A protein has these predicted regions:
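A broadly tuned "polar low-complexity/structure-edge" signature
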Residues: 53, 108, 155, 169-173, ...
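Residue-identity detector for threonine
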Residues: 5-8, 58, 71, 83, ...
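Residue-identity detector for glycine
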Residues: 9, 17-20, 33, 67, ...
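Short acidic, glycine/serine/threonine-rich loops at helix termini
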Residues: 2-3, 75-80, 115-118, 137-141, ...
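Glycine-rich phosphate/diphosphate-binding loop of Rossmann-like nucleotide-binding domains
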Residues: 15, 23-106, 184-268
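Glycine-rich phosphate-binding loop
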Residues: 91-154, 254-255, 259-296
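Flexible glycine-/small-residue-enriched beta->alpha junction loops
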Residues: 1-34, 152-199
Length: 296
């Protein structure tokens, strides 16, 4: 669940367990117009996915590569990594060794780089985090169809700094028992969901003013270096990303009013941004990305 804050106030993440008493897990000030997001994952579903992942690797005789970002979000990706690796150790390690297969874990950005620059001969890429998994799936499909072009091109990445929020400023942890997670803004409930013991949760937000400052830097850098801009946003069903789109238009108008000619830009889905950067790059392009997308 994600939305744009309608009022400035204190936003709180609260857990209600079996005793019915609300326990505050996290709080922060949030300003009107700032985006926030709450997500959780089912540990049971991760376990099912892990069995399917390792069984397929054995069936197709492929080394298994798991990719997550447990260094940045240990209470979310780290929990999923632990779950998957427990399944591997308990059920599949001996069989992997028997048939000569290997299991590897690496950070998701390193995995993305390996897929493009140094892929093994036979590999099964495992990404239990759904959003990133879709991006890499679409990238692999595009690489199979188009490959990497030979033409000369210049690619720059403009990654939003970690201080801006998103995953790098997130609160993340596994819940200790079955219960309900709630998001409250100045005491008013904004969202609630059921969770089970061990399920990882993540709460993150960003600052509207930090977003606009970053967008302004992107425009000025692109103009200085004569680059086209390709933003990657999921604005059609993510209010969280839509605030970036609004910020882009606001900053562009401010620059125009200031007699500054903004460079040409496009807004596309993050998966399309990734595919274009690698399989169909322009002569000179800059690719602004949110924190974790920027890493990838």
């Amino acid at each position: 669940h994600n939305e744009i804050t309608k009022d400035t106030g204190i936003i709180r993440l609260v857990f209600v367990g079996s005793d019915g008493e609300p326990v505050e897990l996290h709080r922060r000030k949030i300003n009107k117009g700032d985006p926030w997001l709450i997500a959780s994952n089912s540990n049971e579903e991760v376990e099912k996915w892990a069995h399917s992942f390792f069984q397929r690797a054995i069936r197709e005789e492929r080394d298994a590569y798991l990719g997550l970002k447990d260094t940045v979000i240990p209470g979310y990706d780290g929990v999923m990594r632990e779950t998957v690796e427990n399944i591997y150790q308990s059920h599949y390690k001996a069989e992997f060794e028997k048939v000569g297969l290997k299991y590897h874990y690496e950070l998701i950005d390193a995995q993305a780089a390996r897929i493009v620059a140094n892929p093994p001969q036979r590999a099964l890429w495992g990404v239990p985090e759904n959003t990133t998994g879709r991006k890499l799936y679409k990238l692999v499909r595009a690489l199979k169809e188009f490959g990497i072009p030979d033409r000369r091109h210049s690619v720059s990445i403009s990654r939003m700094s970690a201080g801006g929020g998103d995953q790098y400023g997130s609160f993340n942890m596994p819940v200790e028992e079955d219960g309900i997670i709630k998001v409250l803004l100045d005491g008013k409930e904004k969202h609630a969901r059921d969770v089970k013991k061990g399920d990882p949760i993540i709460f993150m937000a960003n600052q509207r003013e930090a977003i606009k400052d970053w967008v302004s830097q992107v425009f000025r850098d692109a103009a200085k270096n004569d680059k086209e801009i390709y933003f990657g946003l999921k604005r059609e069903y993510m209010e969280y990303d839509d605030v970036f789109s609004t910020g882009i238009n606001e900053v562009r108008q401010i620059l125009v009013d200031d007699n500054f000619q903004p460079p040409s830009f496009m807004i596309m889905r993050p998966s399309s941004q990734l595919k274009k950067m690698i399989t169909d790059p322009p002569r000179s392009g800059i690719y602004p990305s949110l924190n974790l997308d920027g890493d990838i």
